[in-house]
Regions:
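Glycine-biased, small-residue-rich flexible motifs in mid-sequence functional cores and linkers
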Residues: 1-6, 84-181
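Short, small/acidic-rich helices and loops at N termini and domain boundaries
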Residues: 1-86
């Protein structure tokens, strides 16, 4: 994984429990960059931005062992991190309100240059819902449209199955790291 030093600090900061996109970008705005957040984790001013429990988690994560373990786990899982600072961060994703600071990728991430369509739905969908998602995804895949969904049972699974039946590309997009599945 070839991340710049600044990207490594972005991955570190975005990995701290309790720091989602809103808090992440507020800290970056206040401190300038993720390395400065690391350097100022004990700053009293943090009280303005983070609740006590999150401040403690930030301080606990500010050590070389946590930092090393974070990247060792990614490497062990053959995953890579893509930050908003990375050249390969998806352009369209960067335009949404509060985009994820870091994406964790296993395999290819062809989101920028591929036509794609997201199919999402209930974990407890009906058989008709599963069938519709599977058939729709199969048709899209045959038209060279990448199918994007989560990894939950139900509609997500049916969408991926349909894309595979159609010999297409399927991309699982998670709201968490792949190690949390």
């Amino acid at each position: 994984m070839n991340l710049s030093t600044m990207e490594q600090y972005w991955v570190w900061l975005s990995s701290v429990e309790g720091i989602g996109p809103k808090r992440f970008y507020r800290l970056i705005s206040e401190y300038g960059d993720a390395r400065c957040v690391w350097d100022n984790a004990d700053d009293d001013k943090m009280k303005e931005f983070l609740p006590a429990a999150t401040r403690k988690k930030l301080r606990d994560a500010r050590n070389e062992q946590y930092f090393y373990t974070l990247f060792a786990r990614l490497e062990k899982c053959n995953m890579r991190a893509i930050t908003r600072l990375s050249d390969d961060y998806p352009e369209l994703l960067s335009r949404i309100y509060d985009p994820p600071a870091t994406l964790y990728v296993l395999g290819a991430c062809p989101l920028d240059n591929a036509r794609s369509f997201a199919i999402v739905g209930s974990r407890r969908c009906t058989r008709d819902g599963q069938r519709a998602a599977r058939e729709f995804a199969e048709v899209l895949a045959r038209e060279d449209v990448a199918v994007i969904s989560g990894m939950a049972n139900g509609v997500d699974t049916a969408a991926h199955e349909g894309a595979l039946i159609g010999y297409g590309r399927t991309i699982a997009l998670l709201g968490c790291g792949a190690d949390v599945i």
